[in-house]
């Protein structure tokens, strides 16, 4: 019989952390963070990282494991998460994976697609071409190579455009073809739960309120500490995190304060929309209303308790 694991997946600002902490008080679970922003040290406010009290009450694994200058791939996550899950299961407890980085969840669940590593030489060639003809022209080029990927990638999303073209030039296979080749499936009996408000406007309101609270909590100072470093720039995954790249742009004098706020909130809403789109196509998942936390908690307990008694 396979060991049990629980996934709580949801868009940003949907109340995942709060639900996970409540669940830890009821079940023998250990929390593993599934969030590509929470891995970074010194990036606490803008990532809505659980505070000291919450982490004392319910420790989260895979938080604060990287410096913002370090790279951390999906493959790194899968290896780290599997290691933590093995340790937790061996201790007779249940891994509870919580977060909103959908690619991490998907890769862990179905196995990592064998994508080629980044190739500096190829990337430089693509970036030179983009500088000469523009990213919109490269998006049209991608349409001829991989229409499925091109339809998923916005013409202004230079990072994902670059990666899709790079994969093709390095491997000779399209990104879509490579993604369809999955590795080994997760050897756990996984119970998956999606949490979000029934009404999308509630999520938008929560995102807006949360960002203003981040500002009140010292988000500008937090980013200014990163901005002052000489080893960080906007090409890095850490600084591309939602909120950070907009504040970075403000600190660089590229936009004013009010525009920064507008862009950060808009980008966060866009991220939430993207996360929800992923979830809508997710298989074998139980939906929970984030505005009914006690009901959501009871639903999880009902499903899990009969399998651990």
Swiss-Prot record:
Give one GO term, molecular function aspect. Answer: ATP binding
Q: What is its EC number?
A: 2.5.1.75
GO biological process terms, semicolon-separated: tRNA modification
One Pfam entry name = IPPT
The protein's required cofactors: Mg(2+)
Which residues does the annotation list for site: Interaction with substrate tRNA?
A: 101, 123
Q: Which residues does the annotated region (Interaction with substrate tRNA) include?
A: 35-38, 240-245
Q: Which residues bind substrate?
A: 12-17
Q: Which reaction does it catalyse?
A: adenosine(37) in tRNA + dimethylallyl diphosphate = N(6)-dimethylallyladenosine(37) in tRNA + diphosphate
Which Gene3D superfamilies does this entry report, sorted A to Z? 1.10.20.140, P-loop containing nucleotide triphosphate hydrolases
Q: Which SUPFAM superfamilies match?
A: P-loop containing nucleoside triphosphate hydrolases
Q: Which domain of life is it from?
A: Bacteria
Annotated residues for binding of ATP: 10-17
Q: Which UniProt keywords apply?
A: ATP-binding, Magnesium, Nucleotide-binding, Transferase, tRNA processing
* Name of the top EC class for this enzyme: transferase
**Which protein family is named in the record?**
Belongs to the IPP transferase family.
Tell me the function of this protein: Catalyzes the transfer of a dimethylallyl group onto the adenine at position 37 in tRNAs that read codons beginning with uridine, leading to the formation of N6-(dimethylallyl)adenosine (i(6)A).
Quaternary arrangement and interactors, per the entry? Monomer.
Quote the HAMAP family the UniProt record gives.
Answer: IPP_trans
Protein name per the record: tRNA dimethylallyltransferase
Q: Which organism is it from?
A: Baumannia cicadellinicola subsp. Homalodisca coagulata
The organism's taxonomic lineage, starting at the top:
Bacteria, Pseudomonadati, Pseudomonadota, Gammaproteobacteria, Candidatus Palibaumannia
Gene from which this protein is expressed: miaA
């Amino acid at each position: 019989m396979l060991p049990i694991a629980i996934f709580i997946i949801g868009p940003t600002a949907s109340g995942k952390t709060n639900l996970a902490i409540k669940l830890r008080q009821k079940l023998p679970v250990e929390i593993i963070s599934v969030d590509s922003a929470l891995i970074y040290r010194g990036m606490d406010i803008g990532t809505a990282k659980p505070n000291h009290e919450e982490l004392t009450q319910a420790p989260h694994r895979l938080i604060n494991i990287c410096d913002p200058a370090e790279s951390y791939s999906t493959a790194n996550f899968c290896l780290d998460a599997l290691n933590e899950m093995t340790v937790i299961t061996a201790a007779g407890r249940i891994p509870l994976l919580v977060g909103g980085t959908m690619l991490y969840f998907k890769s862990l669940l179905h196995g990592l697609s064998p994508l080629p590593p980044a190739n500096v030489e190829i990337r430089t060639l693509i970036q030179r071409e983009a500088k000469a003809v523009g990213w919109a022209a490269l998006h049209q080029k991608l349409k001829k190579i991989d229409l499925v990927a091109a339809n998923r990638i916005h013409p202004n999303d230079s990072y994902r455009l670059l990666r899709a073209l790079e994969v093709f030039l390095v491997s000779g296979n399209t990104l879509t073809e490579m993604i369809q080749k999955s590795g080994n499936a997760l050897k756990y009996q996984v119970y998956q739960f999606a949490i979000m408000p029934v009404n999308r406007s509630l999520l938008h309101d929560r995102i807006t309120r949360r960002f203003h609270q981040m500002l009140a909590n010292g988000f500008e100072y937090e980013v200014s500490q990163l901005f002052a470093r000489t080893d960080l720039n906007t090409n890095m995954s850490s600084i591309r995190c939602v909120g950070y790249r907009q504040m970075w742009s403000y600190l660089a004098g590229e936009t004013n304060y009010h525009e920064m706020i507008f862009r950060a909130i808009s980008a966060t809403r866009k991220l939430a929309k993207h996360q929800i789109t992923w979830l809508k196509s997710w298989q074998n998942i139980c939906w929970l209303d984030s505005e009914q936390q006690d009901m959501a908690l009871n639903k999880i307990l009902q499903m899990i308790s009969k399998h651990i008694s």
